[in-house]
Amino acid sequence: MSNTILQNLPEGQKVGIAFSGGLDTSAALLWMRQKGAVPYAYTANLGQPDEDDYNAIPKKAMAYGAENARLIDCRTQLAQEGIAAIQCGAFHISTGGVTYFNTTPLGRAVTGTMLVAAMKEDDVNIWGDGSTFKGNDIERFYRYGLLTNPNLKIYKPWLDDQFIDELGGRFEMSQFLIANGFDYKMSVEKAYSTDSNMLGATHEAKDLEDLSTGINIVKPIMGVAFWDESVEIKPEVVTVRFEEGVPVELNGKRFDDVVELFMEANRIGGRHGLGMSDQIENRIIEAKSRGIYEAPGMALFHIAYERLLTGIHNEDTIEQYRINGLRLGRLLYQGRWFDPQALMLRESSQRWVAKAITGEVKLELRRGNDYSILDTVSPNLTYEAERLSMEKVEDAPFDPIDRIGQLTMRNLDVTDTRNKLGVYSKAGLLTAGQDAVVPQLDKK
């Protein structure tokens, strides 16, 4: 049995808790204090779109019995990691060309490292959070926590039988708070759960576990319900400018603050419901789950970045970017964003792909993920219309005689391929006939 994970409350010791101010962490904090632990509360400001007053959260923690409570501003680091993911195309989950932008894994990478670093400053070496044993976050936080503090111990009230026996459900937790003098009113429970940060929102569980339940039960928190025809959404022309792989301007306005840049991108994309997707994915433990995702700013930057990418880089570079991005996306999802194999892939794309991405893309956004690209401008474009123009051009880069020579060279590999197909045919792997997998070959 691992001695890193504590299954019983460490009485008399400092215990850090990632405190959201919600029912679960409020009840857990008060319960830990009453049972003899010394709880310290840490709240990450991730720019959550559904959080109104961050400064009130540490005050709540102190009222529930925290020895100390701190608000850690993680927004700049989160924005930087979001840009890194855009630069590397670190997204491995998509359906029908619509992408999930790994916004929750990015948030966990930042939260897991920055909160544990803050705990180390307070000499707090035991950490608890609200992740359940069935999800991805329990492993992500475990990895990032131990990477930041090798002496860290993990205590999760939701893995403690005593806590579960006494406060195993939302009703029991709310009654516990009321019995201890806190005027707690349970909110109306939604048909799904939501987790969010500045980069995106995740809606999952409960009714959304049923695949016959559609996206239309979700109330977006970063955009609009574009599927509702009664919601008026006017087309909007948007320009996005990148410099050396970094988004710097929106509609001609330059942003020196990367957090404000993302906020504005979210507002622009959110007006259209851009970046919403419905995905079935494999969790870290290989069981499948379903989620509805929002990421309007990430989607806007991704579209513009990849438009410039395809106009600037050659085919092999683009292919390697996509292959590395798929692998890096999986590593990010698994909580390995700072592992050596991930850093190697990140550095490669950020150095050799992103640095060349300078330019501006103009788009028209409509409803949901419906958009058109109107213009692409970059000093680094290798796209030159006259190279392949169907019109007659002066000083053409090649002529018909050049193409004849190029095609003649193809005789070498066409002959090799034809001979190889003959070998397969003799071996019975290919059959002749009208329904054959390849056209009939001359038997001579």
UniProtKB/Swiss-Prot annotation:
Picking any one GO molecular function of the record gives: ATP binding
InterPro entries to which the protein is assigned, alphabetical? Arg_succ_synth_type2_subfam, Arginosuc_syn_C, Arginosuc_syn_N, Arginosuc_synth, Arginosuc_synth_CS, Arginosuc_synth_type_1_subfam, AS_cat/multimer_dom_body, AS_multimer_C_tail
Enzyme Commission code(s) on record: 6.3.4.5
Binding, ATP: 18-26, 44, 130, 132, 137, 195
Name of the top EC class for this enzyme: ligase
Assign the protein's first listed, main location to one coarse class: cytoplasm
UniProt record, GO biological process:
argininosuccinate metabolic process; L-arginine biosynthetic process; urea cycle
Pathway assignment: Amino-acid biosynthesis; L-arginine biosynthesis; L-arginine from L-ornithine and carbamoyl phosphate: step 2/3
A cellular-component GO term for this protein: cytoplasm
State its location(s): Cytoplasm
Residues at which L-aspartate binds = 132, 136-137
| Xref: PANTHER family | ARGININOSUCCINATE SYNTHASE
Describe its partners and assembly state: Homotetramer.
* Family (UniProt): Belongs to the argininosuccinate synthase family. Type 2 subfamily.
* Full protein name: Argininosuccinate synthase
Species in which this protein is naturally found: Actinobacillus succinogenes (strain ATCC 55618 / DSM 22257 / CCUG 43843 / 130Z)
